[in-house]
Amino acid sequence: MESHYELAEARWFMSKIQDYFRGGKISAGITHKLLEKLDFPCHFAHVKRIFKENDRHNQGRITTEDFRTIYRCIVHREEIVEIFNTYTENRKILPEDSLIEFLTQEQYEMEMDESSSVEIIQKYEPIAEVKNERQMSIEGFARYMFSSECLLFKETCNTVYQDMNKPLNDYYISSSHNTYLISDQILGPSDIWGYISALVKGCRCLEIDCWDGAQNEPIVYHGYTLTSKLLFKTVIQAINKYAFVTSDYPVVLSLENHCSPGQQEVMTDILQSTFGDFLLSDILDEFPDSLPSPEALKFKILVKNKKVGTLSETRERLGTDKRGIALDLEEEIYENEDEDSGKEPETWDDFLSRVKEEQEADPSTLSGIADAKKKIRKLRVALALSDLVIYTKAEKFRNFQYSRVYQQFNETTSMGESRARKLSKLRAHEFIFHTAAFITRVYPKFTRADSSNFNPQEFWNVGCQMVALNFQTPGLPMDLQNGKFLDNGGSGYVLKPDFLRDTTLGFNPNEPEGDGHPVTLTIRLISGIQLPVNVPSNTSDIIVIIEVYGVPNDHMKQQSRAVKNNAFSPRWNETFTFLIQVPELALIRFVVETQGFLSGNELLGQYTLPVLCMNKGYRRVPLFSKSGANLEPSSLFIYVWYYRE
């Protein structure tokens, strides 16, 4: 005899599907639509396969009972039912107190109370009779487990929760390189979509390569190559439209300026007329000699370019006509590599001794600190454009000692990846001392003609704020970039850990001290849910690789066993443990691949996020394609537990 619950469930189910069966039977296409109506979107390829298995007469049409079997196969997943049954006495209904027990003991929702559990029941339980009794059926439980509330990424981290009132140099800033390119750097097209896409992804520092164009119209392209050209004004109009769609926080326009003074003035007119009051053109009264905070610069556009004179001189010229005035600027290119020519990493004590010697020395003896191998390049800078540069004056990096003595608070230095890599290994303490005071931008080496990227993690480890990547090139570096800047609400600004802001702590990513607070992380890989369908995934072995990126000692990965020929619901039930020394800098990446013995592995999907942004308990890991497309409902089902020592 059917129970009260079973009758209620049957009535609810038939009320949802009966209109679709008025003609008797339904096709695979209607089956797919009906599943979506029941709040369970599916990949059509999976539906087709299960439909075929239940089409007993091979007519391409199924009955209500056949559909019920398909529905249960997709919704009443074995691993979900197992968890549900653990907290129910009759394996039919989850009482409210049992739901609270599950949420606190398994999901670590420690603030869960009666009102919160009722809210979950009201939101996810579809059967009215069960909902009214403040209980949950497997239908409601499955809907809750597949909801956004059970995603791996903490909802807290999905909001701007960090202190946004620190100076700009205290933040990692999402930055792009050659933003105008959507392919390689030699023949590839320049496209306005490069800027739109980067801004929508939360990028806050865009690169604009500016050159003289015909009819006094500055253009944007990769100079001395066959890449196509964009009008500067078109780029600026697009930025104006999309700058603050994803984030309210400031956008920095990094101008690679090759224009004549006349066309620099045209650029100035375009910037002022397009951005209006959004364009920062004067120092903020509260920040005359220090960098403002992201909060103070909300909805502002900052110009990063060469600048002549001081900020006080710029303020004195406010409102004056600067048209036709261009000044010569000598850019000194230093090739002194004394600081990065050593073979042994410098210790914290050695660095402190060297800084002390500098402070005690006669300033006149420091005048030659960057004289070796000096070259001079003369530039002509339009005063009008120069005066738009306030807190982001562009300077080439010379060396750390020069910066300590001469660099001004509003100067942003840039260095190529090769030099930055060498310094991060040999002069990590000094590098962190530098980035704690000044914004530092690291860009890909010029030999990356294919627009490939470097691993940004090694430069985040020493506090570099603007680690500029080719956003148009998918792969591991961009996965790390996207994962890093998921944090803090995807605002494009992530507060650096205190040990990268406080130079007295003596942090060295290459030799992290034992007085930190490591994390012991345990992940039970339970199953895959409707993994992406292609020919290999249905015929090949599927593996999951869990990778950790952070300081060098935290780089590690572990791999699951292979599951054969099952992309719909592979089961692993494997447990992996990681000891992470510096969790504040660590990212974790889940990779799903098909294992090909002849053709090599093929990526099915991946997901990357900061370790400290992971929820505990039973969680769903969404998957994204190589290009960054969301592959919902494809996901991994895992159990997460970790503690800090």
UniProtKB/Swiss-Prot annotation:
SUPFAM superfamilies: C2 domain (Calcium/lipid-binding domain, CaLB), EF-hand, PLC-like phosphodiesterases. It catalyses: a 1,2-diacyl-sn-glycero-3-phospho-(1D-myo-inositol-4,5-bisphosphate) + H2O = 1D-myo-inositol 1,4,5-trisphosphate + a 1,2-diacyl-sn-glycerol + H(+). One of its GO terms (biological process) is calcium ion transport. Keywords: Calcium, Cytoplasm, Developmental protein, Fertilization, Hydrolase, Lipid degradation, Lipid metabolism, Nucleus, Transducer. Its EC number is 3.1.4.11. The production of the second messenger molecules diacylglycerol (DAG) and inositol 1,4,5-trisphosphate (IP3) is mediated by activated phosphatidylinositol-specific phospholipase C enzymes. In vitro, hydrolyzes PtdIns(4,5)P2 in a Ca(2+)-dependent manner. Triggers intracellular Ca(2+) oscillations in oocytes solely during M phase and is involved in inducing oocyte activation and initiating embryonic development up to the blastocyst stage. This is 1-phosphatidylinositol 4,5-bisphosphate phosphodiesterase zeta-1. The lineage of its organism: Eukaryota, Metazoa, Chordata, Craniata, Vertebrata. The gene is Plcz1.
